[in-house]
């Protein structure tokens, strides 16, 4: 009988704490560049008319429609410069230009696309990314990276085992060769979240996020929630007009672990999460603030809210990758508490005043106060 009771207690404890399991996480079954996602396998010369690709299936592994060009990076006629930092070739989507590829996935799972995109002419340019039933149109703003080529992430939930990933230029310009430049596309399965024992915040260390290109990264822009309902940064809501930037340890300085977020657009760049609390209970909130060792400098301040209670953590950045951690106490006034973080100021890089940067946020932890 004692053995029976012991096994029963063990099973009960396992069920109660299953969401805090310390078992190793499985590896995402997809995490890399799509077939010819860097466009380095080029069309036959017979399928080219100048830069324009002729024929729906002429670009290996892709299907095209409308005006699509194959271009090389570097200086261009007219004084433009095309940034292609991860290779030699890219595609430019002219008026109503489209490229698409069928990708094998698993129905019901969440995936994130990471892609490099920039505008190629002076006027406003957008790029629409979609899978069947889900789409987003992103404005291309060359103010977040010093080389003019930004990287974006967009997430979706697979509704079948094969999805058609499509990139489309919805614009019609007088110069039909204007349009967004797409230089690389990758996909990653976003694993389900698990709580870290003792922390009420999911993915508080930003360890789960989109695919990061190994050979070159300026950070990955995560669009606002008003544009995306499924986040490539799970657990978090980008609830601002401007995106936040996901950064990794390989290319930037982050306070802890492998990932963090950079709040790149002042009060217009906010990130939030709703956590479960008990009304009337006291909690401790801690988080780290620093710089990404990317030349972002000056007096920084991250403002935070736990429900309606405000907190401020200041940090003087010399652009060398330092950080500090703040600890704050709050009392929950409901069973759900919204945590919100944003930069109080706007910042630019020390030697590049034309591009925005900001404080790094990492290691967000909420525990019951003792």
From Swiss-Prot:
The lineage of its organism: Eukaryota, Viridiplantae, Streptophyta, Embryophyta, Tracheophyta. Expressed in primary and lateral roots, stigmatic papillae and hypocotyls. It is found in: Secreted, Cell wall. Glycans are attached at residue 215. This is Protein TEEBE. Prevents hypocotyl epidermal cells elongation by modulating the pectin status in cell walls. Likely regulates pectin methylesterification degree during cell separation and elongation, including upon root-knot nematode Meloidogyne incognita infection. Disruption phenotype: Increased hypocotyls growth in seedlings under both light and dark conditions, with longest epidermal cells. Keywords: Cell wall, Developmental protein, Glycoprotein, Secreted, Signal.
């Amino acid at each position: 009988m004692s053995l029976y009771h012991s096994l029963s207690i063990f099973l009960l404890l396992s069920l109660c704490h299953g969401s805090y399991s310390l078992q190793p996480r499985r590896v995402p079954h997809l995490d890399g560049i799509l077939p010819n996602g860097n466009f380095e396998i080029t069309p036959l010369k017979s399928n080219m008319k100048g830069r324009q690709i002729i024929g729906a299936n002429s670009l290996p592994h892709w299907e095209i429609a409308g005006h699509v060009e194959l271009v090389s990076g570097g200086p261009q006629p007219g004084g433009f410069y095309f940034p292609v930092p991860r290779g030699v070739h890219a595609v430019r989507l002219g008026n109503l230009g489209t490229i698409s590829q069928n990708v094998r996935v698993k129905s019901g799972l969440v995936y994130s696309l990471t892609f490099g995109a920039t505008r190629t002419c002076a006027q406003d340019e957008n790029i629409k990314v979609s899978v069947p039933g889900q789409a987003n149109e992103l404005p291309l703003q060359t103010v977040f990276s010093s080389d003019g080529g930004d990287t974006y992430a967009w997430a979706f939930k697979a509704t079948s085992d094969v999805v058609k990933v499509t990139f489309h230029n919805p614009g019609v310009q007088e110069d039909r060769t204007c349009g967004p430049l797409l230089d690389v596309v990758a996909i990653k399965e976003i694993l389900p979240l698990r709580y870290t024992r003792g922390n009420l915040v999911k993915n508080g260390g930003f360890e789960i996020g989109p695919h990061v290109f190994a050979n070159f990264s300026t950070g990955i822009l995560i669009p606002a929630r008003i544009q995306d309902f499924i986040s490539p940064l799970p657990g978090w809501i980008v609830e601002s007009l401007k995106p936040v930037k996901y950064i990794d340890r390989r290319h930037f300085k982050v306070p802890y672990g492998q990932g963090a977020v950079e709040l790149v657009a002042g009060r217009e760049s906010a990130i939030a999460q709703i956590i479960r609390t008990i009304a009337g209970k006291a909690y401790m909130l801690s988080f780290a603030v620093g710089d990404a060792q990317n030349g972002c400098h000056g007096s920084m301040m991250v403002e935070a809210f736990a429900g309606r209670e405000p907190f401020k953590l200041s940090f003087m950045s010399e652009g060398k990758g330092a950080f500090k951690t703040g600890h704050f106490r709050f009392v929950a006034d409901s069973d759900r508490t919204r945590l919100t973080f944003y930069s109080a100021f706007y910042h630019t890089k020390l030697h590049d005043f034309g591009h925005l940067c900001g404080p790094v946020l990492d290691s967000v932890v909420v525990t019951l106060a003792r």
